[in-house]
């Protein structure tokens, strides 16, 4: 049988001789490959150290400016390629010997170059430099460049964030200042000036208190309370005389149920203590109760401005002892020998009873003593007298404000006095709010009751002053009361009141505004710092780019030197290719 015909391609590896194939060497195994194939001696490290020491000594004798004029600059290390460049530069300007040899520094560097080329020591140095540059130097520079690029991007992002935050802080500060009604130029002075708005707001509150609807609401409240608490027909009464009449007691009048509200409505508000001064103190002394000198103080401890009133009780006291007995005069004895039977009989006669006088044994009930004093009538008369005296005193004090004082009370207008009192007297203001809240609660409950219906039986027993008020009227009264309470409870009013009366609140408010104003400056400073970091990152990138490019170019030249040197050591018959990561590094640098 004949052999099958086999097609063979000319120029493929099968037909090419081995001597013509290229040699591929990994850059990381280059020195090992050279030593293994005995292209360089095993002690090439020692020989290289000797050559580098001679080169370092020769560098000191170079003319100034020689290194800076080289390809890689003055900072590049001295290796074989640099030695060749120095020799060629010096040889171009150096004198030669009779036989054409180099003289001076050029001859020294020519010897260094020949030492490198002897036994291909420079190939070991080139392989070592390739590994150092590809595995360490270039990756470090690239990581550093990526880090600087990240810092640059982060700086740009932070600059935008800080700029927006500064604008937000400025807008918030302006909004707070606008809400407070200040410009923000001089915070504390402007905040203090805000307190001047408070008298006008309080005068508006006082004017609202004079609405007729509030008077109707208070009278409606008093009428309903009198009806609810009035004694019913057939109920036992323990009082006698005028106290058992059908008239309402003073405590159930609108003026006594809502005292502060009607004090302002009747324009009887006393000025603040700081403005009333001694006149206010004198008025309070004249309008007070009657002081009784009991004779046991031993000095002039009675009320100032009011003479002590001596009351003769028509009863002797117990006998004093010692010096007190001598000063008090003769002793008087009191006979406490009462006959309870006689007292009970007298009480029975006064009551019109016909039964026999009870005895004083243990079975007898409690005995009441009639002192023949009408307590209720006397108390009412005394209370009315004191109220009239107090009204006169308060009126005089309010009238005296026209000649002195300051602020809103200096005009002498009772409404201005009330506004000043509400501003400076927290207790007085709280009592007014209590009166209005009490009135509002009553009206709200009555509105709910009237809206629920089913009160026909109760309505028949109500007096006309209560039954004539329908749900719509109660709602109108409730709206008036809530409007006044709304004026006293607005955030603006509370804030102005705190600014005017609380230095600590003023300090805290000023500190908060100052912090908001400083926040914008902090954000702007942070933005400026971010811009400075961007400049530093750009400068680092700008300085690093030429260094990386020079190092990559150096690696490319070293690679060519190695490939040509190994090919020359092999007689120039085979080409050499240095492979591995070095090609990726050079390719990425070329993009």
UniProtKB/Swiss-Prot annotation:
Entry's Gene Ontology cellular component terms: endomembrane system
Species in which this protein is naturally found: Chlamydomonas reinhardtii (Chlamydomonas smithii)
Short motif Shuffled ATG8-binding motif 1, span: 311-314
Start-end of Low complexity biased regions: 232-250, 386-401
Positions occupied by motif Shuffled ATG8-binding motif 3: 369-372
Membership in a protein family: Belongs to the CDK5RAP3 family.
Name under which the protein is recorded: CDK5RAP3 protein homolog
Positions of the UniProt region annotated as Disordered: 232-252, 269-303, 386-416
